From Swiss-Prot:
Residue spans of biased composition, Basic and acidic residues class: 14-37
Name of the protein in question: THO complex subunit 5 homolog B
Annotated compartments: Nucleus; Nucleus speckle; Cytoplasm
Start-end of Acidic residues biased regions: 301-314
PANTHER family the record matches: FMS INTERACTING PROTEIN, THO COMPLEX SUBUNIT 5 HOMOLOG
GO biological-process terms attached to the record: cell differentiation; mRNA export from nucleus; mRNA processing; RNA splicing
One Gene Ontology term, aspect cellular component: nuclear speck
Disulfide bonds: none
Amino acid sequence: MSSDSLKKRKPKVNRSEDGKRGRHDEQEGRYYSEEAEVDVRDSREDYQLYKDTCVALQRLMSEIQDLKSKGSKDSAMEIEEKKIQSCVHFMTLKKLNRLANIRLKKARDQTHEAKQKVDAYNLQLQNLLYEVMHLQKEITKCLEFKSKHEEIELVSVEEFYSDAPAAISKPEITSTDPHQQTLSRLDWELEQRKRLAEKYKECLASKEKILKEIEIKKEYLNTLQPQLNSIMQASLPVQEYLSMPFDCMHKQYETARHLPAPLYVLFVQASAYSQACDQKLVVAIEGNVEEARALFKPPEDSQDDESDSDAEEEQTTKRRRPTLGVQLDDKRKEMLKRHPLCVTLTLMCKEGSTLTLTFYFLMNLNILTVKVKIQPAFELSTAISAGDLLNPDLILGCLYQGDDGKTTPNPANKYQFDKIGILSLSDYISELGHPYVWAQTMGGLHFPTDQPQPEFVADNALSASHMEKTIKLLKTRLLSRLSLHRQFASLEHGSIPVSLECQSLFPAKVISRLTKWNVIAYEDYLALPYTKDVVECGLAKETDQYFCLLIERGTAKLNGVVVLNPDYSSVPPVFSLCLNWKGERSSSNDDNIGVMESEVNVYYKELCGPPPGFQLLTNQIQRLCMLLDVYLETERHDNSVEGPHEFPPEKICLRLLRGPSRTKPFKYNYPQGFFSHR
């Protein structure tokens, strides 16, 4: 056993001291000689040798098998000899295999080198093609270049030769040379312009002279103004006699004498405010003056109506007695009767939109009602969600907190309604108008809430103290609703309008997009699970308007609902959010959703923009898109899932998470452009 292993083990041959190579070096020499031999040998001959060797091996194997099957003792030497021959053939096959591998390696190397050369030539070709394209563009620019003289409108060639002197036109040269012809035409243009410049100077001097004459005549006319004023003062009796049109203000004051006390106070105070502070405020009196003059006595009390009805029962007439229902209808009409005259206030905003308020006085109820008419300065686009923004019955609701104009402000009216079967004044508001509390204040009326007050006194001081504030609130309400109407038209098309002044509040690239903006009902808002906190805090009322929005990015969908107070933008909108991405997330189960709500609900003052802050809503929605980007890009990626990130991080964040709640950096820092925690 040990002798066989010693025979099989390859002896270690080292280089001798006289410089002869050992066995290892001989093997290396053989390897390299085989590489050189590949270049000399023919692969086809090697292939034929391979086939012959295989055939010889098959023949030797079959002969050995035949000899062994015979079992003759004399055949042992022959079998051993054939084994030796087979080993020689195996050695030949191994050598052929080595040569084939060397050829394969060389073929691969040659292919790789050829591929590299082809790639280099291809790259060089692309560079040359790019240079050719660049040169072609430059050539095109040069060919399309227009000289400055081409923009000058020169006279025609016929006029040039007919008007220009021969020293400039040079017909013997320019008629055959287009270049010289153009130069000569330009010289003639220059000569003409010099002449026109001289004429211009002469005209300016003449203009100055005429202006001086005009100033002298103006001074003369100004000296006539005092004389004309005295003549106008002396002609006042004649104007009254002839009823000249410019005396209409005097007529209006005459008509004001027939106004009831609240409307008269309103007219006087509004006229005074118009003259002193707002000359665009137009105050007018409308209605039937003759009917107003006929009202020489106050309306009869309800007790008198009862006595009259008793007297009618005692009369013996042949006409049919009216039914109880008809009597109640007549009493209701009498109770809700308006004064024949009314006062209209026309408020004009800077952009040209007008808000016309018509004030009526209900004589038996002793209250003022208002009807509204809106005239925008521009054509409004159709927006479904903006349907109620400019509704005359809703636009002035809650101008002051809690004043929706649906109930009467006079406590005495409740007892009057009970007698004639009127359940609520809201059933007649469309016909009579809204009895807002601020309307009573503008008319000098004040009704205490603790006890009925059948008698009223119109106070001028009360009206004057509230006039300016109310007028400003009315204008602000109209402007805010018009601004919201334009914003809603853009939001319904998925576009968030952001002004230039507010673009610094957001990064240049916001990927999340608004895909839905609709109006929803108050009941639908209450049914949403993620609006519970807002409802419990009393921030959602029936007088508010409610909208839903959807912001998407990839598979993430951010649903939100908005509470829009009538007093927008003094009272900011309130947002409630719910994110549908890998489950449903709201402020109740994800602290970062609560932080996103705080960014738009608590820090809204950063988004108001330039006064009066009508862009607050759109800026809040744009911030929500930005916050959704930060939320998704800072979310931890699942490393077990192969492939690229769905939301690759593109925002610069100083710190991704902070605190035990693991809040994300939602605050945008301008102009540095990074996000941080608050």
